[in-house]
Amino acid sequence: MIEFDNLTYLHGKPQGTGLLKANPEDFVVVEDLGFEPDGEGEHILVRILKNGCNTRFVADALAKFLKIHAREVSFAGQKDKHAVTEQWLCARVPGKEMPDLSAFQLEGCQVLEYARHKRKLRLGALKGNAFTLVLREVSNRDDVEQRLIDICVKGVPNYFGAQRFGIGGSNLQGAQRWAQTNTPVRDRNKRSFWLSAARSALFNQIVAERLKKADVNQVVDGDALQLAGRGSWFVATTEELAELQRRVNDKELMITAALPGSGEWGTQREALAFEQAAVAAETELQALLVREKVEAARRAMLLYPQQLSWNWWDDVTVEIRFWLPAGSFATSVVRELINTTGDYAHIAE
């Protein structure tokens, strides 16, 4: 298995170094659900601003304030503790009376707004996230500037970030031990983290191998292509390659890579053979995913940050703004810009 730090770069390994998250204010995340509260219903959507506390901690505190069980408070995704983050929580509070959430007090957390909603907010039910990052102590401004320009055109690898694999890769190591011993894992959280890490690592490996090709975005026979911004995909045939290539070049279509698991991976012929060869050595992890009935899926190979802009405060400090769809990692963008010191694994997805 390729170590995360050794995954192939799309724009080559950065020439300079820099510091990500010198302080929480250097990493700002604003959640974008893609919809507004209904204004009625048995749930309450609460938009919070937090700094220095994780999402589960705030959700539990909100449940205690509302005098409801912790499981009645949900959220679309975990947000980093060591950052300034804005996100929505959802509390099930039936009845006509609206609680006064302006009285909710928690250090590092502020209620921005709240309203009734008809449906529970479920994990993953968001459109994306807007990021504002500050990179400090940048050693090579010219290199970072050119990389930002190139990313606007060519994007970045859509790798799962190091945080998916746990501190020091602990989640992936857990999956590997599980795959080797076949011992039942009864802890639901461990099962989820380990299976997710296994599948994500295999995806990253397939993408890393594909990026070694001279023309990364070249459509091949049997590729599974995804409509940009959509989850559906279809298989490319030899007769259509020229037209499909044009649409990929225009960013109408995205080449996908496999999230291995049980069932067919989605690619065929040449593309399928390539993906299978890329992870051929990882038989134990593949067998684990099949055994645990984790269904195979597809994910775009490249990621194009939207609304990308940047502003140099001075020669060694740059503020970068962009929007990413749900499931994508800001650290995968930063990885193509600078070599950073420290471990990304503490940054929540």
From Swiss-Prot:
Entry keyword annotation includes Zinc: no
Catalytic activity reported: uridine(13) in tRNA = pseudouridine(13) in tRNA
Stretches that traverse the bilayer: none
EC number(s) reported in the record: 5.4.99.27
A GO CC annotation given for this chain: cytosol
Binding-site residues for substrate, renumbered to this chain: F27, N129, F329
InterPro entries with a match to the protein in the record: PsdUridine_synth_cat_dom_sf, PsdUridine_synth_TruD, PsdUridine_synth_TruD_CS, PsdUridine_synth_TruD_insert, TruD_catalytic, TruD_insert_sf, TruD_pseudoU_synthase
Pfam families per the UniProt record, alphabetical: TruD
UniProt xrefs under Gene3D superfamilies: TruD, catalytic domain (3.30.2350.20), TruD, insertion domain (3.30.2340.10)
Region of interest (RNA binding), residue spans: 180-187
Gene Ontology annotations of biological process type: pseudouridine synthesis; tRNA pseudouridine synthesis
One of the record's GO molecular function terms: tRNA pseudouridine synthase activity
Record key words, sorted: Isomerase, tRNA processing
Limits of the TRUD domain: 155-303
Function, in words: Responsible for synthesis of pseudouridine from uracil-13 in transfer RNAs.
Family matches, as HAMAP family: TruD
Family named by the database record: Belongs to the pseudouridine synthase TruD family.
NCBIfam families assigned to the protein according to its UniProt record, in alphabetical order: PRK00984.1-4, tRNA_TruD_broad
Subunit note: Monomer.
Family annotation (PANTHER family): TRNA PSEUDOURIDINE SYNTHASE D (PTHR47811:SF1)
Protein name: tRNA pseudouridine synthase D
Classification of source organism: Bacteria, Pseudomonadati, Pseudomonadota, Gammaproteobacteria, Enterobacterales
Protein's gene: truD
